[in-house]
């Protein structure tokens, strides 16, 4: 390792994580982002945008399974799914495993992200870009949800952190647009950072989403390269019952979907909605 250069993440001040770089596969500044993909002995291929790790081959399955199977199995009858972001294709891969879904629309602001991920992160999409149910739209997510005539049963916001291009996906304009194109009984989910270190993000999202949805909460998972504690995912719907389904119902839907997962299971689904007290306290503070 001493002979290999080190890549340091710049997300937090005063502490962080580093990766040894075995081989740089791609590094280029696009119109929107500074993007790098490199090999690391511990985590396989690593993709980072603007100095922040976005995904690694070794642990991406945790994030993508939880972002997809939790809302899709909670809904129980989703036919039309919208993914905002997700250019690496792994979110699409997991959504496409649900054969009952009829259409999958993905909106990505940067066509370059999609093209190089197909080349350099092929295990992430695993051929899902060729699914006949899939449509790719190159557009700004806020613009799309406020202009589209399509409606969706589940919306998944695979957004980056709320800096740079990702900032708009944490705004009231985006959340209002998502509510606008979400079918009755639909579910919206979004990554919302590691709540111990990024608590303000969770509080801000909760406050804004509550203007548009009757039931707003979070669920969580522990993802190694998103260090600092549990990662939270925002959850918003007008049907509170969908967040409190019994493990028996989730188990039956999981069995019917014929899924085999590496992290997600019905027990994890139910337990994921249990949140630490410090987050409850922050969300309820005046």
UniProtKB/Swiss-Prot annotation:
It comes from the Bacteria. Its EC number is 2.5.1.16. It catalyses: S-adenosyl 3-(methylsulfanyl)propylamine + putrescine = S-methyl-5'-thioadenosine + spermidine + H(+). SUPFAM superfamilies: S-adenosyl-L-methionine-dependent methyltransferases. The active site is at 158 (proton acceptor). The keyword Transferase applies. It holds the Pfam family Spermine_synth. This is Polyamine aminopropyltransferase. The gene is speE.
């Amino acid at each position: 390792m001493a002979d290999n250069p080190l890549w340091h993440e710049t997300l937090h001040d005063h502490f962080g994580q580093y990766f040894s770089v075995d081989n740089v596969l791609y590094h280029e500044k696009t119109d929107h982002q500074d993007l790098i993909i490199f090999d690391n002995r511990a985590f396989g291929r690593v993709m980072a945008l603007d100095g922040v790790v976005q995904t690694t081959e070794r642990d991406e399955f945790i994030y993508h399974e939880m972002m997809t199977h939790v809302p899709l199995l909670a809904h129980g009858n989703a036919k039309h799914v919208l993914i905002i972001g997700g250019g690496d294709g792994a979110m699409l891969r997991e959504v496409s495993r649900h054969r009952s879904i009829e259409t999958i629309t993905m909106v990505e602001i940067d066509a370059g992200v999609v093209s190089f991920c197909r080349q350099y992160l092929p295990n992430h999409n695993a051929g899902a870009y060729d699914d006949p149910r899939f449509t790719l739209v190159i557009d700004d997510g806020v613009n799309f949800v406020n202009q589209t005539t399509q409606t969706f049963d589940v919306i998944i916001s695979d957004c980056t952190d709320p800096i740079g291009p990702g900032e708009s996906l944490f705004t009231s304009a985006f959340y209002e647009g998502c509510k606008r194109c979400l079918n009755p009984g639909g579910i919206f989910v979004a990554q919302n950072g590691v709540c111990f270190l990024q608590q303000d993000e969770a509080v801000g999202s909760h406050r804004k989403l509550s203007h548009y949805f009757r039931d707003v909460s979070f669920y969580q998972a522990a993802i190694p390269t998103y260090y600092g504690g549990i990662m939270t995912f925002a959850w918003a719907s007008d049907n509170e019952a969908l967040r409190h389904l019994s493990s028996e119902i989730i188990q039956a839907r999981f069995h019917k979907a014929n899924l085999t997962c590496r992290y997600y299971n019905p027990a994890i689904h139910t337990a994921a909605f249990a949140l630490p007290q410090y987050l409850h306290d922050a969300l309820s503070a005046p």
